[in-house]
Amino acid sequence: MRICIISEGCYPYVVGGVSGWVHSMIKTFPNQEFILLSIIANRELSGKFAYKLPENVTEVHELYLQDDDWGSVNKLHKSKLKQKEYHALRSLLLDQDVEWTVLFDYFCNNNVSINELLMGEDFYHAVLDAYNLQYPDIVFSDFLWTMRSMYLPLFLALATDIPKADVYHAVSTGYAGIIGSMGKHFHKGQFIVSEHGIYTREREEELIKAEWVQRTYKNIWIRQFKKMSKVAYNTADAVTGLYEHACELQEVLGCPKEKLMITPNGIDYKKFENLPAGSPENKQYINVGAVIRVTPIKDVKTLIQAFAYAKKRCPKLKLWIMGPYDEEPEYAAECFKMAEQLEISDIEFTGRVNVTDYLGWMDMTILTSISEGQPLTILESFAAYVPVIATDVGNCRGLLYGEDDDFGKAGILTHIMNIE
Protein backbone atom coordinates (compact mmCIF):
# COMPACT_ATOMS: atom_id res chain seq x y z
CA MET A 1 0.00 0.00 0.00
CA ARG A 2 1.22 3.48 -0.89
CA ILE A 3 0.33 6.11 1.72
CA CYS A 4 0.81 9.86 1.19
CA ILE A 5 1.25 11.83 4.42
CA ILE A 6 0.37 15.50 3.92
CA SER A 7 1.66 17.86 6.59
CA GLU A 8 1.92 21.61 6.95
CA GLY A 9 4.75 23.25 8.85
CA CYS A 10 5.81 20.19 10.82
CA TYR A 11 7.24 16.81 9.77
CA PRO A 12 10.03 16.25 8.93
CA TYR A 13 11.35 19.82 9.37
CA VAL A 14 10.23 20.68 12.90
CA VAL A 15 10.41 18.70 16.13
CA GLY A 16 7.14 18.55 18.04
CA GLY A 17 4.13 16.51 19.04
CA VAL A 18 2.57 16.18 15.59
CA SER A 19 5.92 15.51 13.93
CA GLY A 20 6.76 12.87 16.52
CA TRP A 21 3.37 11.23 15.95
CA VAL A 22 3.90 11.09 12.17
CA HIS A 23 7.42 9.69 12.59
CA SER A 24 6.21 7.00 15.00
CA MET A 25 3.31 6.04 12.74
CA ILE A 26 5.60 5.56 9.73
CA LYS A 27 7.99 3.42 11.79
CA THR A 28 5.08 1.36 13.13
CA PHE A 29 4.21 0.16 9.61
CA PRO A 30 7.59 -0.81 8.09
CA ASN A 31 5.97 -2.93 5.38
CA GLN A 32 3.94 -0.04 3.98
CA GLU A 33 5.35 2.51 1.53
CA PHE A 34 5.05 6.13 2.65
CA ILE A 35 5.53 9.27 0.61
CA LEU A 36 5.59 12.74 2.13
CA LEU A 37 3.98 15.84 0.71
CA SER A 38 5.28 18.53 3.02
CA ILE A 39 3.95 22.08 2.97
CA ILE A 40 6.56 24.60 4.11
CA ALA A 41 6.99 28.35 4.00
CA ASN A 42 9.71 28.74 1.38
CA ARG A 43 12.55 27.11 -0.54
CA GLU A 44 15.11 28.02 2.12
CA LEU A 45 13.73 25.19 4.25
CA SER A 46 14.00 22.62 1.46
CA GLY A 47 15.59 19.38 2.61
CA LYS A 48 16.41 20.67 6.10
CA PHE A 49 14.99 17.71 7.98
CA ALA A 50 14.94 17.47 11.76
CA TYR A 51 14.30 13.72 11.55
CA LYS A 52 16.15 10.88 9.88
CA LEU A 53 13.56 9.50 7.49
CA PRO A 54 12.65 5.82 7.93
CA GLU A 55 13.60 3.48 5.09
CA ASN A 56 9.96 3.00 4.06
CA VAL A 57 9.70 6.70 3.12
CA THR A 58 10.38 6.52 -0.61
CA GLU A 59 9.59 10.06 -1.80
CA VAL A 60 9.45 13.60 -0.41
CA HIS A 61 7.52 16.30 -2.28
CA GLU A 62 7.59 19.92 -1.14
CA LEU A 63 5.09 22.75 -1.58
CA TYR A 64 6.24 26.30 -0.81
CA LEU A 65 3.47 28.67 0.30
CA GLN A 66 5.71 31.75 0.06
CA ASP A 67 7.31 30.91 -3.25
CA ASP A 68 9.43 33.75 -4.64
CA ASP A 69 9.31 32.05 -8.04
CA TRP A 70 5.51 31.99 -8.31
CA GLY A 71 5.48 34.70 -10.97
CA SER A 72 7.70 32.71 -13.32
CA VAL A 73 6.13 29.28 -12.85
CA ASN A 74 4.13 28.01 -15.86
CA LYS A 75 4.46 31.40 -17.50
CA LEU A 76 2.00 32.94 -19.87
CA HIS A 77 -0.38 30.11 -20.50
CA LYS A 78 -4.14 30.38 -20.67
CA SER A 79 -5.54 33.17 -18.47
CA LYS A 80 -9.15 33.46 -19.66
CA LEU A 81 -11.50 31.26 -17.67
CA LYS A 82 -14.48 29.37 -19.04
CA GLN A 83 -17.87 30.34 -17.65
CA LYS A 84 -18.05 27.47 -15.13
CA GLU A 85 -14.46 28.14 -14.03
CA TYR A 86 -15.16 31.82 -13.50
CA HIS A 87 -18.35 30.96 -11.58
CA ALA A 88 -16.34 28.63 -9.30
CA LEU A 89 -13.68 31.31 -8.75
CA ARG A 90 -16.29 33.99 -8.03
CA SER A 91 -18.10 31.70 -5.59
CA LEU A 92 -14.81 31.08 -3.81
CA LEU A 93 -14.17 34.80 -3.36
CA LEU A 94 -17.78 35.50 -2.33
CA ASP A 95 -17.84 32.67 0.25
CA GLN A 96 -20.69 30.96 -1.58
CA ASP A 97 -21.08 27.24 -2.33
CA VAL A 98 -17.82 26.48 -4.11
CA GLU A 99 -17.53 23.91 -6.88
CA TRP A 100 -14.14 22.72 -5.74
CA THR A 101 -13.84 19.97 -8.32
CA VAL A 102 -14.11 22.58 -11.08
CA LEU A 103 -11.20 24.46 -9.50
CA PHE A 104 -9.22 21.24 -9.04
CA ASP A 105 -9.62 20.39 -12.73
CA TYR A 106 -8.85 23.93 -13.88
CA PHE A 107 -5.55 24.14 -12.03
CA CYS A 108 -4.55 20.58 -12.91
CA ASN A 109 -5.47 20.45 -16.59
CA ASN A 110 -4.62 23.91 -17.91
CA ASN A 111 -1.00 24.50 -16.90
CA VAL A 112 -2.19 27.63 -15.12
CA SER A 113 0.05 30.66 -14.75
CA ILE A 114 -0.67 31.84 -11.21
CA ASN A 115 0.87 35.20 -12.09
CA GLU A 116 -1.50 35.61 -15.05
CA LEU A 117 -4.49 34.54 -12.98
CA LEU A 118 -3.85 36.82 -9.99
CA MET A 119 -3.03 39.83 -12.16
CA GLY A 120 -5.63 39.05 -14.81
CA GLU A 121 -9.06 40.35 -15.69
CA ASP A 122 -11.11 37.43 -14.33
CA PHE A 123 -9.63 37.58 -10.84
CA TYR A 124 -9.96 41.37 -10.83
CA HIS A 125 -13.67 41.24 -11.70
CA ALA A 126 -14.35 38.54 -9.10
CA VAL A 127 -12.60 40.64 -6.45
CA LEU A 128 -14.54 43.72 -7.58
CA ASP A 129 -17.83 41.83 -7.17
CA ALA A 130 -16.83 40.72 -3.67
CA TYR A 131 -15.82 44.28 -2.82
CA ASN A 132 -19.06 45.89 -4.06
CA LEU A 133 -21.30 43.31 -2.40
CA GLN A 134 -19.52 42.88 0.92
CA TYR A 135 -16.79 45.47 1.62
CA PRO A 136 -17.65 48.80 -0.09
CA ASP A 137 -16.41 50.88 2.85
CA ILE A 138 -12.73 49.95 2.67
CA VAL A 139 -10.04 51.10 0.22
CA PHE A 140 -10.34 48.98 -2.94
CA SER A 141 -6.63 48.91 -3.79
CA ASP A 142 -5.83 47.56 -0.31
CA PHE A 143 -8.59 44.99 -0.66
CA LEU A 144 -7.37 43.87 -4.09
CA TRP A 145 -3.79 43.30 -2.96
CA THR A 146 -4.94 41.58 0.22
CA MET A 147 -6.99 39.16 -1.86
CA ARG A 148 -4.02 38.49 -4.13
CA SER A 149 -1.78 37.73 -1.16
CA MET A 150 -4.50 35.59 0.44
CA TYR A 151 -5.16 33.49 -2.65
CA LEU A 152 -1.53 33.06 -3.71
CA PRO A 153 -0.83 30.19 -1.26
CA LEU A 154 -4.17 28.55 -2.03
CA PHE A 155 -3.52 28.73 -5.77
CA LEU A 156 -0.01 27.34 -5.26
CA ALA A 157 -1.59 24.42 -3.42
CA LEU A 158 -4.19 23.91 -6.15
CA ALA A 159 -1.46 23.92 -8.82
CA THR A 160 0.61 21.24 -7.06
CA ASP A 161 1.29 17.94 -8.78
CA ILE A 162 -0.34 15.32 -6.58
CA PRO A 163 1.57 12.02 -6.34
CA LYS A 164 -0.48 8.88 -6.82
CA ALA A 165 -1.31 6.96 -3.64
CA ASP A 166 -3.81 4.48 -2.25
CA VAL A 167 -4.40 6.58 0.88
CA TYR A 168 -4.00 10.32 1.48
CA HIS A 169 -3.59 11.16 5.15
CA ALA A 170 -3.64 14.87 6.01
CA VAL A 171 -2.54 15.73 9.53
CA SER A 172 -4.56 18.95 9.47
CA THR A 173 -7.13 20.69 7.34
CA GLY A 174 -6.07 23.98 5.69
CA TYR A 175 -3.73 23.60 2.73
CA ALA A 176 -3.03 19.97 3.65
CA GLY A 177 -6.76 19.30 3.50
CA ILE A 178 -6.95 20.86 0.04
CA ILE A 179 -4.12 18.62 -1.18
CA GLY A 180 -5.78 15.53 0.29
CA SER A 181 -9.09 16.42 -1.34
CA MET A 182 -7.31 16.76 -4.68
CA GLY A 183 -5.59 13.40 -4.20
CA LYS A 184 -8.94 11.70 -3.72
CA HIS A 185 -10.44 13.55 -6.69
CA PHE A 186 -7.68 12.76 -9.18
CA HIS A 187 -6.37 9.37 -8.03
CA LYS A 188 -9.46 7.92 -6.29
CA GLY A 189 -7.51 7.15 -3.13
CA GLN A 190 -9.03 7.05 0.33
CA PHE A 191 -8.69 10.30 2.28
CA ILE A 192 -8.23 10.61 6.05
CA VAL A 193 -7.95 13.82 8.08
CA SER A 194 -6.35 13.57 11.54
CA GLU A 195 -6.45 16.84 13.48
CA HIS A 196 -4.31 17.17 16.60
CA GLY A 197 -5.33 20.78 17.08
CA ILE A 198 -8.32 22.27 15.33
CA TYR A 199 -6.56 24.03 12.44
CA THR A 200 -9.24 26.66 11.85
CA ARG A 201 -9.39 27.62 15.53
CA GLU A 202 -5.61 27.85 15.77
CA ARG A 203 -5.41 30.17 12.76
CA GLU A 204 -8.28 32.23 14.17
CA GLU A 205 -6.49 32.63 17.51
CA GLU A 206 -3.30 33.73 15.74
CA LEU A 207 -5.19 36.28 13.64
CA ILE A 208 -7.05 37.72 16.62
CA LYS A 209 -3.72 38.34 18.36
CA ALA A 210 -2.00 39.75 15.25
CA GLU A 211 -1.65 43.52 15.58
CA TRP A 212 -0.61 44.03 11.95
CA VAL A 213 -3.90 42.76 10.46
CA GLN A 214 -6.90 45.10 10.38
CA ARG A 215 -10.12 43.75 11.86
CA THR A 216 -11.95 43.50 8.52
CA TYR A 217 -9.11 41.54 6.97
CA LYS A 218 -8.90 39.27 10.02
CA ASN A 219 -12.50 38.24 9.39
CA ILE A 220 -11.77 37.62 5.70
CA TRP A 221 -8.80 35.40 6.54
CA ILE A 222 -10.81 33.48 9.14
CA ARG A 223 -13.56 32.77 6.61
CA GLN A 224 -10.88 31.62 4.16
CA PHE A 225 -9.58 29.02 6.58
CA LYS A 226 -13.11 27.88 7.46
CA LYS A 227 -14.05 27.15 3.85
CA MET A 228 -10.75 25.34 3.30
CA SER A 229 -11.47 23.14 6.31
CA LYS A 230 -15.02 22.50 5.18
CA VAL A 231 -13.98 21.07 1.81
CA ALA A 232 -11.56 18.70 3.57
CA TYR A 233 -14.26 17.55 5.99
CA ASN A 234 -16.76 17.00 3.19
CA THR A 235 -14.29 15.15 0.96
CA ALA A 236 -12.65 12.95 3.59
CA ASP A 237 -13.71 9.36 4.16
CA ALA A 238 -12.86 9.64 7.87
CA VAL A 239 -11.97 12.50 10.21
CA THR A 240 -10.35 11.89 13.58
CA GLY A 241 -10.08 14.10 16.65
CA LEU A 242 -8.12 13.49 19.83
CA TYR A 243 -11.01 13.86 22.27
CA GLU A 244 -14.77 14.36 22.37
CA HIS A 245 -14.85 18.16 22.45
CA ALA A 246 -12.47 18.32 19.47
CA CYS A 247 -14.91 16.25 17.44
CA GLU A 248 -17.74 18.53 18.55
CA LEU A 249 -15.77 21.52 17.22
CA GLN A 250 -15.10 19.72 13.95
CA GLU A 251 -18.83 19.11 13.57
CA VAL A 252 -19.58 22.80 14.25
CA LEU A 253 -17.06 23.71 11.54
CA GLY A 254 -18.88 21.58 8.98
CA CYS A 255 -17.73 17.98 9.35
CA PRO A 256 -20.53 15.42 8.89
CA LYS A 257 -21.01 13.66 12.23
CA GLU A 258 -20.95 10.18 10.71
CA LYS A 259 -17.34 10.69 9.56
CA LEU A 260 -16.01 11.61 13.00
CA MET A 261 -14.14 9.30 15.35
CA ILE A 262 -12.04 9.84 18.46
CA THR A 263 -8.45 8.60 18.21
CA PRO A 264 -6.60 9.72 21.36
CA ASN A 265 -2.86 10.10 21.61
CA GLY A 266 -0.81 7.35 23.16
CA ILE A 267 2.76 6.90 24.35
CA ASP A 268 5.03 3.99 25.20
CA TYR A 269 4.77 4.32 28.97
CA LYS A 270 7.50 1.72 29.54
CA LYS A 271 10.07 4.25 28.30
CA PHE A 272 9.33 6.30 31.40
CA GLU A 273 9.93 3.55 33.95
CA ASN A 274 13.04 3.72 36.16
CA LEU A 275 14.17 7.10 34.85
CA PRO A 276 17.56 8.40 36.03
CA ALA A 277 17.58 10.53 39.15
CA GLY A 278 19.08 13.98 39.14
CA SER A 279 22.48 14.97 40.44
CA PRO A 280 22.89 16.11 44.07
CA GLU A 281 23.23 19.66 42.75
CA ASN A 282 19.91 19.49 40.92
CA LYS A 283 18.17 17.99 43.94
CA GLN A 284 18.86 21.23 45.83
CA TYR A 285 16.16 22.88 43.69
CA ILE A 286 12.46 22.49 43.10
CA ASN A 287 12.76 21.59 39.44
CA VAL A 288 10.06 22.70 37.01
CA GLY A 289 10.21 21.29 33.49
CA ALA A 290 8.65 22.70 30.32
CA VAL A 291 8.91 20.32 27.36
CA ILE A 292 8.08 22.78 24.61
CA ARG A 293 9.29 24.36 21.41
CA VAL A 294 10.20 28.02 21.96
CA THR A 295 7.43 29.43 19.75
CA PRO A 296 4.60 31.94 20.27
CA ILE A 297 1.86 29.30 20.43
CA LYS A 298 3.58 27.85 23.52
CA ASP A 299 3.57 31.37 25.06
CA VAL A 300 7.06 31.07 26.51
CA LYS A 301 7.00 34.75 27.49
CA THR A 302 4.16 34.12 29.94
CA LEU A 303 6.09 31.11 31.24
CA ILE A 304 9.15 33.27 31.93
CA GLN A 305 7.09 35.96 33.65
CA ALA A 306 5.23 33.38 35.73
CA PHE A 307 8.52 31.83 36.80
CA ALA A 308 9.87 35.27 37.78
CA TYR A 309 6.73 35.86 39.86
CA ALA A 310 7.04 32.47 41.59
CA LYS A 311 10.82 32.69 42.05
CA LYS A 312 10.44 35.78 44.25
CA ARG A 313 8.20 33.76 46.56
CA CYS A 314 10.13 30.50 46.37
CA PRO A 315 13.86 31.05 45.69
CA LYS A 316 14.57 27.32 45.35
CA LEU A 317 12.69 27.07 42.04
CA LYS A 318 14.58 26.23 38.87
CA LEU A 319 13.02 26.18 35.38
CA TRP A 320 14.15 23.85 32.62
CA ILE A 321 12.84 24.77 29.15
CA MET A 322 13.46 21.62 27.15
CA GLY A 323 12.95 21.92 23.43
CA PRO A 324 14.34 23.48 20.24
CA TYR A 325 14.58 27.25 19.89
CA ASP A 326 15.58 27.49 16.23
CA GLU A 327 12.08 27.23 14.71
CA GLU A 328 11.28 30.93 15.27
CA PRO A 329 14.65 32.50 16.15
CA GLU A 330 13.33 36.05 16.52
CA TYR A 331 10.79 34.97 19.12
CA ALA A 332 13.41 32.85 20.89
CA ALA A 333 15.76 35.86 21.02
CA GLU A 334 12.96 37.93 22.58
CA CYS A 335 12.48 35.22 25.23
CA PHE A 336 16.21 35.13 26.04
CA LYS A 337 16.23 38.92 26.31
CA MET A 338 13.16 38.92 28.57
CA ALA A 339 14.84 36.48 30.95
CA GLU A 340 17.90 38.75 31.08
CA GLN A 341 15.90 41.94 31.57
CA LEU A 342 13.90 40.39 34.41
CA GLU A 343 17.23 39.35 35.95
CA ILE A 344 15.99 35.84 36.56
CA SER A 345 18.50 33.25 37.61
CA ASP A 346 17.96 29.52 37.34
CA ILE A 347 16.37 29.31 33.89
CA GLU A 348 17.95 26.76 31.59
CA PHE A 349 17.19 26.64 27.85
CA THR A 350 18.47 23.16 27.04
CA GLY A 351 17.57 22.97 23.36
CA ARG A 352 16.40 19.65 21.97
CA VAL A 353 17.01 16.86 24.47
CA ASN A 354 15.91 13.35 25.33
CA VAL A 355 13.21 14.12 27.89
CA THR A 356 13.73 10.79 29.66
CA ASP A 357 17.09 12.15 30.85
CA TYR A 358 15.27 14.92 32.71
CA LEU A 359 11.73 13.87 33.66
CA GLY A 360 12.87 11.53 36.44
CA TRP A 361 14.02 14.43 38.61
CA MET A 362 11.40 17.02 37.74
CA ASP A 363 9.11 17.94 40.63
CA MET A 364 6.48 19.16 38.19
CA THR A 365 6.09 20.13 34.55
CA ILE A 366 4.34 23.18 33.15
CA LEU A 367 2.61 24.08 29.90
CA THR A 368 1.56 27.67 29.11
CA SER A 369 0.29 27.12 25.56
CA ILE A 370 -2.46 29.28 24.11
CA SER A 371 -3.58 26.34 21.95
CA GLU A 372 -3.13 22.58 22.26
CA GLY A 373 -4.70 19.32 21.25
CA GLN A 374 -3.91 16.48 23.63
CA PRO A 375 -0.32 17.27 24.67
CA LEU A 376 2.12 14.39 24.66
CA THR A 377 4.19 16.18 27.27
CA ILE A 378 1.35 15.79 29.77
CA LEU A 379 1.01 12.07 29.00
CA GLU A 380 4.78 11.64 29.37
CA SER A 381 4.76 13.51 32.68
CA PHE A 382 2.01 11.24 34.00
CA ALA A 383 3.94 8.15 32.88
CA ALA A 384 6.89 9.47 34.91
CA TYR A 385 4.63 10.18 37.94
CA VAL A 386 5.14 13.93 37.59
CA PRO A 387 2.23 16.35 38.22
CA VAL A 388 1.45 19.10 35.71
CA ILE A 389 0.45 22.76 35.67
CA ALA A 390 -1.27 23.62 32.38
CA THR A 391 -3.48 26.17 30.69
CA ASP A 392 -7.11 25.28 30.08
CA VAL A 393 -6.77 24.63 26.36
CA GLY A 394 -7.45 21.60 24.21
CA ASN A 395 -7.85 18.43 26.26
CA CYS A 396 -5.72 19.63 29.18
CA ARG A 397 -8.76 19.81 31.48
CA GLY A 398 -9.73 16.24 30.68
CA LEU A 399 -6.18 15.00 31.25
CA LEU A 400 -5.58 16.84 34.52
CA TYR A 401 -9.02 16.65 36.12
CA GLY A 402 -10.32 13.47 34.51
CA GLU A 403 -13.33 12.58 32.42
CA ASP A 404 -15.96 10.39 34.07
CA ASP A 405 -13.49 8.89 36.54
CA ASP A 406 -12.72 9.23 40.23
CA PHE A 407 -8.92 9.21 40.09
CA GLY A 408 -8.69 12.79 41.36
CA LYS A 409 -6.68 15.70 40.04
CA ALA A 410 -3.24 15.22 38.50
CA GLY A 411 -2.19 18.86 38.58
CA ILE A 412 -3.38 22.44 38.38
CA LEU A 413 -5.31 24.06 35.55
CA THR A 414 -5.25 27.81 34.87
CA HIS A 415 -6.33 30.23 32.17
CA ILE A 416 -4.00 31.40 29.42
CA MET A 417 -1.54 34.28 29.98
CA ASN A 418 -1.84 33.97 33.78
CA ILE A 419 1.50 34.77 35.40
CA GLU A 420 0.23 34.19 38.94
Outline where the language-model segments fall.
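Glycosyltransferase donor-sugar binding loop
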Residues: K318-A333
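Aromatic "clamp/platform" in nucleotide-sugar-dependent glycosyltransferases that forms part
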Residues: I370
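Short hydrophobic beta-strand element within catalytic cores of glycosyltransferases
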Residues: P387-A390, G394-L400
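Short acidic alpha-helix that forms the nucleotide-activated donor recognition element
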Residues: K230-N234, G351-M362, A383
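Conserved donor-binding/catalytic core segment of Leloir-type glycosyltransferases
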Residues: P276, P280-Y309, W320
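Carbohydrate-associated surface elements
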Residues: H245, G266
